[in-house]
From Swiss-Prot:
It is found in: Secreted, Extracellular space, Extracellular matrix. This is Collagen alpha-1(VI) chain. Residues 1-24 form the signal peptide. The lineage of its organism: Eukaryota, Metazoa, Chordata, Craniata, Vertebrata. Residues 297-309, 375-392 have a biased composition (Low complexity).
Amino acid sequence: MKMLQGRLPLTVLHLFLLLGGGMTQQRPQGPIKDINGLPAQGPTVSVRPGPDPSDKVTFQDCPVDIFFVLDTSESVALRVKPFKTLVTQVKEFTKKFIDKLTSRYYRCDRNLVWNAGALHYSDEVILINSLTRDMKTLRDNVETVEYIGKGTHTDCAIKRGIEEVLIGGSHQKENKYLIVVTDGHPLEGYKEPCGGLEDAANEAKHLGIKVFSVAISPNHLEPRLSVIASDASHRRNFTATSAVGLTDDEIDNTIDTIIDMIKENAEQGCCTYECKPSRGLSGPSGPPGYEGEIGKPGLPGDRGLPGDPGRQGDIGPVGYQGMKGDQGIRGEKGGRGAKGSKGDKGKRGIDGVDGQKGEDGYNGLPGCKGSPGFDGAPGSSGPKGDPGPYGTKGEKGVPGTPGTGGRPGNTGNTGDKGDPGSNGLAGEKGESGDEGDAGADGSPGKRGEAGELGPPGVSGGRGARGEKGEPGPPGDQGRDGPAGPFGDPGEAGPQGPKGYRGDEGPRGPEGPKGPRGAKGLPGEQGIAGERGDDGRPGNGTDGFPGFQGYPGSRGDPGSNGTKGYPGPKGDEGEQGEPGDDNVSPGPPGPKGAKGYRGPEGPPGPPGPGGPPGPDECEILDIIKRMCSCCECTCGPLDLLFVLDSSESIGLSNFQISKDFILKVIDRLSRDEHVKFDADNSHVGVVQYSHGQTQEVVAMGDSSIQSIGQLKEAVKNLKWIAGGTWTGEALAFTKDNLLKRFTLEKKIALVLTDGHSDILRDKTPLNTLCEVTPVVSVGVGDIFQNAPNSDQLVQISCGGKPYSKGLSLQRTSFAELLDDGFLHNVTSHMCSDRKCPDYTCPITYEGPADITMLVDSSTRVGNQHFQTSKSFVKLLAERFLKAKPPPSGSARVSVVQYSGQNQQIVEAQFLTNYTVLEVPVDNMQFINGATNVVSALRAVTELYREDSLAGVNKKLLVFSDGNTQEEKGLLKVVQDAQSAGIEIYVLAVGSRLNYPNLQVMLTGSAADIAGPFPEERLFRVPDYTSLLQGVRYQSISRRIALKSSQ
């Protein structure tokens, strides 16, 4: 219809020129000028002089307002390296578009001209240029655009563009366009401040502004771009960037397609039937045409003039109500009115129809573990058992308590929607409108001269079928029609799931007595009862005695009777003759009864001393193995989280980041026994995006006094969705959070995608390095870009000598919640745990020279000798790595011995364990006799030659007391004592020579020596036990103590 309206004026004009006759086509003589004396724009027509020679025309402009809305947010500026690449491509796209905005002449004698403007936006809107026809200035201003790089408020930008084209644009309201170039992010997560994207798009539609949406690829959000576009024809997968492999020709084709659509729509708007350009000069007469076809019947003529009024007639009878008259003839169209003034802003339009159902969202995170379910339904009945024996009838049971009411079952699924009802009855036809007033009589036109009949025209061929036109804009919402009858009820929905088993209901009333059952089978015979009591004697009198019976038959012989009882004791006999003499004693008599308890005797002498009980080292080891309080602790510490809340993180990833923080806190509390409260460890969280957007929640805030309140505050953090200024956020943490946390041990964890805008944010990324260790965790962003490892290394103080930081990377945010990763993070935070000191440390009260005399004889054997070497190394390490004495040092010697003159000094008074370890490892088993006397003599000589004066001299002898030469043992021990040597003995095994051990420990003969000095004798059951437990700690600590001599 619009196409017909646009061409109708041209058809009428051509017909009028043909009928006018006498027209000739002339070439313009020189440049044609408009009424102001300026050269006319566009094609011109010269007309033969008529009644008014000055009637020269100009072509009216057909203005089109086009406004560019350019996205320069973080998701565009920082998505592709090098940064600003996509912003540069967007600017190039806009400049190419501007270059192609050239004027065009329409056949309705109107000239298309462009008014163009632009803005760019992020979380703020910056006007590049208002609407102008100066394309060069607009192009230059676009070239100077610098990206904002923060959040994305597309709704605000579109509404600002609407404002610009309405206020600064032309009066041609149907020729207003917005070109929105964006990636569509973010999809969700925060309240858009200007009413939302759909609200902005609907406002543009209601105001007749057509919106094209052009994608910034890759990873654009197509659903959001479809919402922005006025309809599908204004989207068409338009793309402004070459990051997805598009060529320049393909981008140029996008621009040409949009411009062609605008020009075609503008022609329909400018070239309508209302277009009445001034009449041009008559052209030359054309050749006579062929005779035309017989015309169709003409339209009804105008109504004639009313006749003169007749005379007054007689009053007739009252008539019946007449039928409603036919509709009056439509009056002629009035002339074009003057241009109206701009109207007031219209009221808010009606709400648009509901949009289609959105795509399914991403799967939610696994929920928390549910509460225990209700008891399951009872199992199916088992097979019927064999009938048992009939029991005795039981007593009547106690009436049960009424049960509570059962829980209602779950509501079943809603049934399918019923079929729509049939259409309602059509409403009554409305009454015709009142008859219109008659139009003014037109002046009769002059009768034209009849033209010559032309020959019949040749029938034209059938034209090609026209292409289907674009769908028209949606019409206004119709008024609600009458409600139809209710539809038939829908089919019953599928049966709902079986509800949970309800609780046992109350006991019902006793039912009626059932019919008597069939006679049961006979039961098994019962066990015979006990004999009943004798009955009471009868009441009758004694009967008379009966007659004597006949004698019975002879019975069988009886059995032998039992032995009779002994008879009475006889009289005492006469004394017998004396027997022969017997020199052997008789047997001893029986033991007498136990006598009475005698008086308490005097106390006995003291018994020998028992073996020594566990010493301090052994007690500490027992405590360590039995007591949970001996575990190492991580705290107290101050824990700082710095959380990236920028747009490139995405809402779902931001939620995972908060869950990660909460899980780290929980693991530190549970596994590392960190206690978070005001007097122990503290936690603080800083979330950030671009400049001045930091937000901190920490223990110690007025509303956060416990770890539970802090967790709740972390859960309530809202996604900022702006730029990424990590350096500024770290400086904010240093200035605002670290000042509040004053514990010596602290650590910061920075969670980011590693894409900080270092072009805008000049704060160094290693700001926290000098004040606290930093763990940087980098995770890929929503565009699947890997984190920037260089930035992560800077954040975690990589390459600094004082650094205790750690840099970790993950592909996706879901990996943050993996148990293994959480364990690694918390283990690093607690790498320097504070553990109780159960090593039983050595304490020297003065300088000491310690010698270990190792048995290398056949009695020991090579395998046990190797065990002795390992034990010697443990002792030596303890002696030499302990805290040195206040003055001087501790020195250690190692000597092995066997037979006569078989003593080897392996290490002589060394102070460095590393140096001593090598000769001990190289010790070779001698495998000779056992001569302790010769060994003690050699060691005494060693002390006299190399030991320092004023030091404590200690000697540990590996011996079980057995020696080939016992005669000189006492003397060499006394010589050693006189040299100031204190002797300790390590005795292994059960075959010990205690007399010799007593001589070695006391320096006295075995028969006159006092009790064993147990503090200097170390008994070990076997060589394997040497390396078990804390025996080496006990022995070394006891040797290192001050001498007891």
